[in-house]
């Protein structure tokens, strides 16, 4: 077995000294201790930075007056380039908003030309235009689904659902319909309307042969007018019916009208000849308009007028009755 004695210094020196000289051992030991020294220096630097930050925070914690300051991110300094960038971004945002509003207004103007509401003096608001367009689209879809043409009153009621009164008047005027013929507040959710006037159940209709009902889009909604016989008191004095009166002809002669001679007296008085004492003139005298002068002069005492003839110089017998009643 080949072994080398440890006491031989020559062999050890030649074998070890060829690769690693003895002078390098001290250098290696010195190099191994350098990283620890660097860590110590870094720790000292970080401690110094922390102390500076603490001092800054202490300084920022109070202002000149000793009041606490706001903590948070510090505001960046406004340089000229940054001011220009902010101004450009703001101008671009304003231009986008302006273009958006112009496009919206143009679309609403186009929509106002389509909906059935036109006025030269009044312009619909944005919300009223959108509501009317929604009702119009819904009404057209109902027409397409049912395949029947609706009544004009029903169509207008559908269009005016949820609209204000001025817009309702405009729509009714555009469709040539009176806005009083329907009540938009009583419209239900579905378009099931009878097409009749809501006032028809309150007022009973009066059918007269002398009155002609006007023809219109909704005949049922128009309330016929009633003829009043204003000339019925004069018809008993003539053989034929007066053409100015709208009342029907009478089947037989009527009794003379009742005379109102006083407040509390309601009785029929016999005709009195007033022609003898008429030098003061007459008042409240109702002369038949169609009678000629000769007929009125010849039959003045025989005819009985619907109103009393009061003479200025005449004493009434009813006055005595009134005085007796009050005394």
Curated annotation (Swiss-Prot):
Name of the protein: Neurogenic differentiation factor 6-A
CDD domains linked: bHLH_TS_NeuroD6_ATOH2 (cd19722)
Pfam families: HLH, Neuro_bHLH
InterPro entries: bHLH_dom, bHLH_transcription_factors, HLH_DNA-bd_sf, NeuroD_DUF, TF_bHLH_NeuroD
Keywords attached to this entry: Activator, Developmental protein, Differentiation, DNA-binding, Neurogenesis, Nucleus, Transcription, Transcription regulation
Keyword Nucleus: yes
Source taxon at top rank: Eukaryota
Start and end residues of each bHLH domain: 88-140
PROSITE patterns per record: BHLH
Single GO molecular function: protein dimerization activity
Record's subunit section: Efficient DNA binding requires dimerization with another bHLH protein.
Signal sequence, start to end: none
Span(s) of short sequence motif Nuclear localization signal: 74-80
Example of a GO biological process term: positive regulation of transcription by RNA polymerase II
